[in-house]
Each structure stands twice: as C-alpha cells, then as structure tokens.
C-alpha cells in the first residue's frame, strides 16, 4: 500500500520553520507546567497503598469515601470505579502502622458497613522504596538519551546525534506535560510509556536519517535541504502506516482498557503523534540549524568508504597469500 507516490517530492523543509516555532512555544508552555505545577506523584513514587475491592452489588463509592475520611490516618484517600459498577479502586498515602497491626485488616474493618465485598488486590509501597523507584526512573530516561546520542554519533555525525536527542527531549517534555494536563499520577507506567516513546521515535528518526545519508551519498541532489525533502518523501508512506497502526492499537487500549493502564496508554497515544511529527519536522531541521554541511559530510563518508574498501582489499590479499 502506497499513500504517496515516490516521484512526488514534498517540501517539508519549506514549512519546518513554522514547525520549530510551534514546537518551541509548546515546549516552553510544557516546561512551565512541569516546573510550576509539577507532577502528582502516584503510589509507586510517593509511597502508599492501592486496594482493589469487588462488591456483590453496585459499589457505594461515596459511602466508602466517607468511611475512610472519618479515620484520621486515611486523609487524602481516592476512590474510583474500576472496570465495572461493582468494582472500585482505593488509593491512599502511606500509613504508619504498629508492629501488631495489619493494614489489610484495618481497611477491611473500615469497609464493613459498606456491604458485602471482597478485597481482590492490596499493594503497598513504602516511602523509601518509592523514592528509589523515582530516582531509577529518572536515571533510566537520562541513560536512554545518552545511549542514543552515542549510537547516532557513531553511525552518522554529531549534528545528527544532537538533533535526534533534541527531538527526543522535545517529545518527552510534551508527553510528560500531558500527564499533568490530564491529571494522571506519575507512576512506573508513565516512565514505561516515555521509554517506549523514546525507542519508537528514534526508530522513525533513524529510518529518515538513513534515507538522508543515501540521498547525499548518491549525489543526485544539489543541497542538503533537497536531500532531506526527498528522504522524508520516500519514507513517508512507511512512517504514516506504522504510526497509524500503533496509534489505533493504543487508542483501543485508552478506550477499552481499564483505568489502571491509563498511565501507559494515554501518554503513548499522545507520544505516537508527537514522535512522528518530530521525526519529520524537528530532527532534520535541527541538524540543518546546527550547521550541517552536505559537501563536508560527503567527503568524510567517501573517505570512510574508501578506507573500508582498502581494508577489505588487504584482507583478501592476506587470505589469498599474496601479502
């Protein structure tokens, strides 16, 4: 299936300046949200408990909330429907208990007046563990970006590497800010979505960069802008079909999945759009803004190819006994 004819070259770089300006404005607004409002840390990072309860009748959400609010230790409790009208999810901050106290039994005792129920899941994360998980989550994102920059530098050149990382940071900032806008708790699911997004977005960028390199080395194009336009146009069908496939799969997760996975599915849904956009409009344009020179790049790549060919020739001569 081909959405766009390969012979048709679209002028992406002509409009990329507008894309960069829009992205810069959105990124600044997103940074404002991140710094001034901040994330609502979930149980994974802040510590606390998550209780899944199923009733034999419709769950009395308001009554359950009132029962917990009467207890001084359970301030800030959140009660929401989970999957069906009979099932609810209860979240509350970490509660200190004595050695002889069982938190599970305490919660069950609080819920007794609300009707016939079954506690199906009870997870608790301590503050220390939550802090460690938060540090490891942030570290994993930083290491992923560094590893990608090293890899792209080795495969292409530093301008491409820096451009790809800037595009990825742009993606992460916008998606992370959407977590605040949609009032999603920052948990491990969100970190998993961000890491998945980084891998997905860099894959798109690498495919476009590969095609750009082929166009430049073929010397069919006169300048870098033309080479980039031809490269993006030739990979556009593949990029859009892949993105649409991922988009609709994640959309189904958002619509029909339970609330417990919304921390993964919604950031991924937004990230699919943002990642595809940045691979086409941001990463190539940033490489040009960083002073990428097509002639110098061609000379360096030609030198590398000749060096590799000479090594291969010497290896063959050595194996044949001529050297």
Curated annotation (Swiss-Prot):
Entry keyword set = Cell inner membrane, Cell membrane, Membrane, Protein transport, Translocation, Transmembrane, Transmembrane helix, Transport
Main subcellular location = membrane
One Pfam family, please name it: SecD_SecF_C
Q: Where is this chain's protein located in or outside the cell?
A: Cell inner membrane
The protein's topology relative to the membrane is: Multi-pass membrane protein
The keyword DNA damage appears for this protein: no
Quaternary state and interactors: Forms a complex with SecD. Part of the essential Sec protein translocation apparatus which comprises SecA, SecYEG and auxiliary proteins SecDF-YajC and YidC.
What name appears for this protein in its UniProt entry?
A: Protein translocase subunit SecF
Q: What is this protein's gene name?
A: secF
């Amino acid at each position: 299936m081909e959405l766009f004819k390969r012979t048709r070259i679209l002028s992406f770089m002509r409009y990329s300046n507008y894309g960069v300006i829009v992205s810069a404005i959105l990124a600044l607004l997103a940074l404002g949200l991140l710094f001034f409002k901040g994330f609502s840390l979930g149980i994974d990072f802040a510590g606390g408990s998550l209780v899944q309860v199923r009733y034999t009748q419709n769950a009395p959400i308001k009554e359950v909330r009132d029962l917990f609010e009467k207890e001084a230790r359970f301030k800030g409790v959140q009660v929401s429907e989970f999957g069906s009208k009979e099932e609810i999810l209860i979240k509350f901050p970490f509660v200190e208990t004595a050695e002889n106290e069982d938190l599970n039994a305490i919660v069950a005792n609080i819920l007794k007046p609300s009707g016939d129920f079954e506690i199906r899941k009870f997870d608790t994360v301590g503050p220390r563990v939550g802090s460690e998980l938060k540090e490891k989550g942030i570290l994993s994102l930083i290491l992923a970006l560094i590893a990608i920059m090293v890899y792209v530098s080795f495969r292409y050149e530093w301008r491409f590497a820096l451009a790809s990382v800037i595009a990825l940071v742009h993606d992460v900032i916008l998606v992370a800010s959407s977590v605040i806008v949609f009032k999603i708790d920052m948990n491990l699911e969100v970190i998993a979505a961000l890491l998945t997004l980084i891998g997905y977005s860099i894959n798109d960028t690498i495919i476009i960069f590969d095609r750009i390199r082929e166009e430049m080395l073929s010397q069919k194009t006169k300048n870098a802008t033309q080479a980039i336009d031809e490269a993006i146009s030739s990979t556009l069908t593949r990029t859009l079909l892949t993105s649409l496939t991922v988009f609709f799969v994640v959309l189904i997760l958002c619509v029909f999945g339970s609330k417990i996975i919304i921390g993964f599915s919604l950031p991924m849904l937004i990230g699919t759009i943002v990642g595809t956009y940045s691979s086409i409009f941001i990463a190539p344009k940033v490489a040009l803004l960083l002073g990428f020179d097509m002639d110098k790049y061609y000379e360096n790549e030609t030198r590398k190819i000749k060096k590799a060919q000479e090594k291969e020739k010497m290896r063959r001569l050595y194996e044949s006994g001529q050297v």
